[in-house]
């Protein structure tokens, strides 16, 4: 179900990013990193890079500034008796791994089986992004999203499946591109009832 606060782009806020102030010690840390790589932070092309990088990372990790559970505060009880699976497939997201701070790029499938109320569809994506925009590991991200929906909506079941590629594997270390990692968390009937589990996995496209 959509609500009046759902944005046309599926829940993402659109607009220019404000130029937040960057503390001197943060900018200097990035200058130090540039020097360590072998480049000169004082050359023309890199003069503004420390500020850009600092602001970019503040944006990449803006999930720390919010409680994703708040997106589930508003629910709808008048749903015409609907009591079947609600599923959002292929929600794109970006995160960064906590080990190398390398990009994690993927998509999530989020489903729940409502008990007596539903939530606006963009709110599921907002929960995902609230946790993804932090330093993460995919396993924890999957669990956090599922647990948040389970605790916030008290549905009969929750299923979260995440598929992602990891920069720490594709561009460093074993340098193996094209590898996708899949994680899942099933709760309630999707964990305990084989028929319900098969149904939701089939809808996701993994049955």
Regions from the PLM with identified roles:
Residues 1-207:
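A domain-level signal for the structural core that forms small-molecule/cofactor-binding pockets
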């Amino acid at each position: 179900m959509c609500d009046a606060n759902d944005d046309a782009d599926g829940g993402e806020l659109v607009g220019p990013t404000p130029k937040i102030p960057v503390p001197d010690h943060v900018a200097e840390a990035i200058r130090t990193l540039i020097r360590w790589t072998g480049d000169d932070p004082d050359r023309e092309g890199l003069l503004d890079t420390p500020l850009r990088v600092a602001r970019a990372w503040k944006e990449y990790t803006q999930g720390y500034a919010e409680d994703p559970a708040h997106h589930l505060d508003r629910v709808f009880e008048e749903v015409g008796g609907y009591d079947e699976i609600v599923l959002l497939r292929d929600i794109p997201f970006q995160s960064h791994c906590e080990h190398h701070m390398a990009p994690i790029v993927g998509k999530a499938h989020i489903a729940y089986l409502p008990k007596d109320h539903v939530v606006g569809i963009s709110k599921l994506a907002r929960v995902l992004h609230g946790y993804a925009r932090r330093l993460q590991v995919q396993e924890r991200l999957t669990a956090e999203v599922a647990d948040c929906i389970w605790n916030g909506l008290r549905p009969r079941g929750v299923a979260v499946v995440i598929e992602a590629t990891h920069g720490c594997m594709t561009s460093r270390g074993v340098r193996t591109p094209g590898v996708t990692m899949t994680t899942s968390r099933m709760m309630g009937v999707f964990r305990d009832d084989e028929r319900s589990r098969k149904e939701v996995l089939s809808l996701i496209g993994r049955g």
